[in-house]
Amino acid sequence: MRQLAELLTDLLGPVPTMFLWVIVSFAFFRALQFIVRWYLFGKWTWPNFNFFDIRNRIRRRRRGGQEAENTENPPENEAEAGEQVEQEPEPDSRDLSAIPPNKKWRISNECVSLFHSVISGLWAAYALLYYKQLVQDLVNYRCDVAINLVLMSAGYLFHDLVDLLVNEQSARIIELLFHHVVVLSAFAVTMFFNRFLGVVVFGLLMELNSIFLHSRSLLNLYGVDKKSPSFRIIALLNMVTLFAFRLCVSAYLVYFVVVSIPDLEWYVSIINGLVIASLASTNTVLTYRLLAADGLLGSRRTRRTPAATAETQVGDVESGPLRTQVEDEDHHTIGVQTIHGTTEDATQTV
């Protein structure tokens, strides 16, 4: 493998070779995504889910119904008219994460994400354990093992960006897209400026927690009872690894940014600070959501497991409620039933 990499570098140059490995990784994860879909559900694709279209149709129908009602029974005053409009709450796409309309796609996407988490998390741990200089010199030390890890993960992130944008448009994925863009920016800095490889590999240690995070999401998507032993074990391991590999790593990287300010150019320090602060903030939000979802912040903030209904059983539908091309009225019904029928489990938004 190393000889092949050296041969390609000699033939193409270092930068084209890096792009080639990212493309190979992207193609691998795209192919794996379709293989998982076919293996689990016997289908390659499902209808695209666009929450914003559904919400707009709900609003148009609501306005139309309100106008018709006002024509038949006009309100006596403006206050009464305002109360009529506010009776039905505004839909929120985050609520749809508890019973995803595109449930089969979500399951296949989580499976591929879980596979990447296992590979990249263990790879990052191996690199840090066996290449001590990565830990001792986070800025300048470079090695092929860590570089190849970054290129592989970049290909996966590009794949996941495409998969999210093609299959779902909702507020739920905005956080994921933000996370992916931040991480890809960190990858670009370390690959094109030949610095901070150790910082990036430390960040990829967070994937060790993602193993249990994606496992937890899969259990939620399959409607596993949160009181079952399997769910409790995964939830416990998720919280332990969250503290060890997300919060502790984030704290260490923030410390590194602060102490390295005198040794780095001002603009480099700003870039480092923005990237690491963004990751630290997303990890903080994730921690809060997990604590709330597991009931550790009180019963009022506890999130329920997705309800097991006939419409959302994985084995019975093609793609959740949006299994076929439906009329506008069906779109409205789907959105309202999903929004009011359950409570969000926010761990699925990560």
Curated annotation (Swiss-Prot):
Effect caused by changing H116Y: In et50; suppresses the glucose intolerance defects of paqr-2 (tm3410) and mdt-15 (et14) double mutants
Localization annotation: Cell membrane
The encoding gene: fld-1
Region entry Disordered, spans: 65-100
PANTHER family: CT120 PROTEIN, TLC DOMAIN-CONTAINING PROTEIN-RELATED
Purpose of the protein: Regulates the composition and fluidity of the plasma membrane. Inhibits the incorporation of membrane-fluidizing phospholipids containing omega-3 long-chain polyunsaturated fatty acids (LCPUFA) and thereby promotes membrane rigidity. Does not appear to have any effect on LCPUFA synthesis.
Compositional bias annotation for Acidic residues: 75-90
TM regions (residue ranges): 9-29, 111-131, 145-165, 173-193, 195-215, 229-249, 270-292
Main localisation: membrane
Phenotypic consequence of H214P: In et51; suppresses the glucose intolerance defects of paqr-2 (tm3410) mutants
Any Gene Ontology CC annotation: plasma membrane
Membrane-topology descriptor: Multi-pass membrane protein
Stored PROSITE patterns: TLC
Tissue and organ distribution: Ubiquitously expressed.
Keyword tags: Cell membrane, Membrane, Transmembrane, Transmembrane helix
Source organism (scientific name): Caenorhabditis elegans
Domain (TLC): residue spans on this chain: 102-279
Protein name per Swiss-Prot or TrEMBL: TLC domain-containing protein fld-1
GO biological process per UniProt: membrane assembly; phospholipid homeostasis; plasma membrane organization; regulation of membrane lipid distribution
